[in-house]
């Protein structure tokens, strides 16, 4: 029995910091097109995979229709990308076995990250997967420095010895009081 995978791309036009963000062009290509291309490339390599843009704005669905990108209208009451994903999933005729939330403002997501999520799920099914990377000291230093000017960019995760998430934070966790001694 094949397992159905659905990549949902939540896209909100009414962004506070950058209204119309999904349709902003990056090097001449709309951001939502770039993210949809990532999803499409994953689906080409996974026969039971499909993708859909989830939005509450007709400007985005109109663009998607013109560009040949599958899209679904969601409720205007969704408070987050995750809620928008769930709303889109609930509107599907056939319920997927595995749902991937690929944020519509993530045009630089490497496709191998999504493929690895799929591979991990197939190898060891679980309810939730969150990709994360282990930082070396140079990367940690860069993260700490960038948090000084953009404190809410990026999420850190604390994992146990088996890789299970214990906590997520917009701050840097775990707190390392004297990193020079821990190196």
Residue ranges of model-derived segments:
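N-terminal glycine-rich phosphate-binding loop and ensuing alpha1 helix
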Residues: 3-55
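Conserved core of the sugar-phosphate nucleotidyltransferase
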Residues: 109-183
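Alpha-helix N-cap and loop-to-helix initiation/capping positions
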Residues: 24-27, 73, 145
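Glycine/serine-rich loop-strand microenvironments at binding/catalytic pocket rims
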Residues: 1-9, 62, 70
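Short beta-strand segments
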Residues: 10, 101-103, 131-134
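Short, high-confidence coil segments that cap the C-terminus of an alpha-helix
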Residues: 48, 94-96, 123-128
């Amino acid at each position: 029995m094949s397992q159905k995978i659905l990549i949902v791309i939540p896209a909100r036009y009414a962004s506070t910091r950058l209204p119309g963000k999904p349709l902003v062009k990056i090097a001449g290509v709309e951001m939502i097109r770039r993210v949809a291309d990532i999803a499409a490339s994953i689906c080409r390599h996974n026969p039971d995979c499909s993708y859909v843009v989830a939005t509450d704005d007709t400007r985005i669905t109109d663009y998607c229709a013109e560009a040949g990108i599958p899209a679904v209208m969601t409720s205007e009451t969704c408070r987050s990308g995750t809620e928008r994903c769930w709303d889109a999933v609930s509107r599907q005729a056939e319920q997927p076995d595995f749902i991937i939330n690929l944020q519509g403002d993530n045009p630089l997501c490497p496709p191998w990250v999504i493929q690895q999520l799929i591979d991990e799920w197939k190898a060891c099914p679980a309810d939730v997967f969150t990709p994360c990377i282990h930082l070396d000291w140079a990367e940690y230093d860069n993260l700490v420095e960038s948090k000084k000017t953009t404190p809410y960019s990026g999420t850190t995760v604390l994992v146990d010895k088996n890789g299970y998430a214990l906590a997520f934070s917009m701050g840097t966790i775990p707190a390392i009081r004297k990193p020079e001694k821990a190196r």
